[in-house]
Amino acid sequence: MKRIFSLLLAGLLVFLLAACGAPAAPALPDAGPDGSSALKLDTLNVEFAIGERDADELMRLQAELPPLLLSALENENVTVETVSITFGASAEATAQALEDGSVDVAFLPSEAFVLSDPPLRLIAVENMSVPAGEYFPDIDFAALPDVAADSPIYENIVAGSDDTPVALGAAFSRALVMLCASADGNAVMQRYGSASYLISGHPGTLLTPLVTCLTLEVEE
């Protein structure tokens, strides 16, 4: 049986500011011409969990996504010097990199969010109207602080920590929405296909309505 899921690409945000060896906080200079605060970042580290995806498509994604993302961010008054795209050998490895702060944004399946220890913070999701306990029957939800067995299950998740200013969230959210709305951006993200995404360094706040970027078929 096939179920159609949407890959939600909205609410993109960066930065896990660790105490030791972390990069400096992003500069927050004077307001831009539209009244929004200009943001400057040296590097945005984005990691995709490889799974069973085609290696050639991932290499194309690695080459094609950075300039599109840079342009989308620039339109939101955000200047990023470098977008670094890496690939994790597994969802668990990518989730760990997110927790450790070596990755700012991670594209992951929802299982990686639910099983993350320490737990990642839930920010925004798509409601699939299925109780979490039915969707993940082998998970002990009593041990999870943010998800209950009777909660609606969320196939696509945005999560993060508490360390980044809220002001960054809206800018990256709009940038990724714009990227996914463009033909070029959508085509590039199609190279990855199925994934949820997690965001490091963001307080638990719903930033904008989630936006459908891709439609997937998942075998059951």
Which residue stretches match the model-derived regions?
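Extracytoplasmic small-molecule ligand-binding "clamshell" domains
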Residues: S37-V114
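Bacterial signal peptide processing site
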Residues: G21-P23
